[in-house]
Amino acid sequence: MFGNLKKKLSSAIQEGLVISENLQQQYRQRVSSGNSGSSQASGITTPISPLGLNESLSSSRSSSLSLSAPFQLTDGVPSHLNVAAGCSLLAKYEDDWQQIHGANEKNAEKAAQIANQISGIQDQASHQHRIMSELNSSLAGIPTLIAQLQNSSQVLNSLEEMGKQLEIELEKLEDLREECELQEFILEQQFQLSRHKQKKLNELEQYRQQIAQKHQSKIKDQEQTLLKLQRERQAVFDDAFREDMEEYKQRGQLTKIQTTSNKLALEEVVLEANEVETKDALEQFLNG
């Protein structure tokens, strides 16, 4: 936008310069052709007014024209004609354009700032809009959420009941497990007891066999001892019998062997304490 305006102002300045040069050339041609300067000057001044010349500009430039009168006279231009009016106007337009350009740059900066602010506001509005949309969707889902919460509450209640039932079943299972462990312990103890009993029986059998072997060996030893004694007694008896037979053959009779038996009197018997008690009990029984 500002570039187009600058181009238009530049083209206007160039056109103004071209027009001023054409005017100077026309004045020079008319002066050289011998026409009256007053009539032509009046005819030339008339088209200047449409270019935006006014009395304030001609009065402001009168001092500069009076200083440049010799130059204009040499060129054939009247002294009361303001040839630099277009340049002053163009300079004024250029100054105005520079001011406008500066103001436009400031406006552009402010517009950029405002655009940034608008973008920020738009972003905030979009964010708020998105939040509102999410809030609306969330609010729209509240009934469904309430229904789900109710279902969840029912499920939790059912789970609580199932948990209680599960605790009861777990207690039963624990009791059953303890009972099974007790039975296993009893069976294990019975098995250990049976093993111990069998072990003791085996040991007892081994001990009995050992005792039996020892007893058999003792019996054999005793039998051998008795047999030896019997043989010795038999030998003694045989010797005594032969002696008796020899004596009988020689004398015709046998000598009597006197045996003395040790007899005890009743007064000589001494009873111990247990025997005294037994005697007292016997007397009470007989007297009773």
From Swiss-Prot:
Transmembrane segments: none annotated. Disulfide bonds: none annotated. Keywords: Coiled coil. GO terms for cellular component: BLOC-1 complex; neuromuscular junction of somatic muscle; synaptic vesicle. It comes from the Eukaryota. Residues 147-239 form a coiled coil. The keyword Coiled coil applies. InterPro entries: Dysbindin. One of its GO terms (biological process) is long-term memory. Belongs to the dysbindin family. Component of the biogenesis of lysosome-related organelles complex-1 (BLOC-1) involved in pigment granule biogenesis and membrane trafficking in synapses. In response to high synaptic activity at neuromuscular junctions, stabilizes Pldn protein levels and, together with Pldn, plays a role in promoting efficient synaptic vesicle recycling and re-formation through early endosomes. Component of the biogenesis of lysosome-related organelles complex-1 (BLOC-1) composed of Blos1, Blos2, Blos3, Blos4, Dysb, Muted, Pldn and Snapin. Interacts with Pldn and Snapin. PANTHER family: DYNAMIN N-TERMINAL DOMAIN-CONTAINING PROTEIN (PTHR16294:SF6), DYSTROBREVIN BINDING PROTEIN 1 DYSBINDIN (PTHR16294). This is Dysbindin protein homolog. It comes from Drosophila melanogaster (Fruit fly).
